């Protein structure tokens, strides 16, 4: 289950942290982004390269993935790492995949849990008293989404499933774009945010119609110091469906990236909602 039934991707540059020098401040900003993604049910975070960047895409991916990982799996997936020093201090996202440990007698077939394949390749640590038996061999240390098929005090069986089949929001995935920030057939409606874009009120009716019919949406954001026209080219309008200005009457020099992300996600959710009355 995603934002208003749509699959949503946000695309952010690897310069989104350029205003911050300390590890603590960078981590806090990524924590805000992770929280907004979770609140609005974002499926994918795509990190694209900005030529003026400091090469922070790997760090960004690591922190965002750490925050999305259930707490009971973090030590298995992430070894001690100085770059994650402050990530553990951030409040947990508490999304549905971040389940608490439950007694085996309360575990029911049909439940979903996140897990990591153990060294034998056939069992999975899913945060329970005993490993879940997978029924087939998979790569050790691989993270899987598991559907419990049977459970008793002595044995738990499950099978790996695609998280898209789960009827509730299950978290976001993070990728570092190797090509264009605009790639991705799953998210064909592309909306770029820019202070040089069309005021949102001017395109809101047309945007609402397109959102209703779109199966997937990509929202693109620039870094604090410059816009998407400078990063992706002056022909940006030819590459995307919309270029919108979310704050046409802003009273600050620059809206922060995380503020733009929150505002855009709220707006998209509102416009795509079937409960929103028709515009007159």
What are these regions (language model features)?
Residues 1-280:
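Post-transcriptional modification and biogenesis factors for structured RNAs
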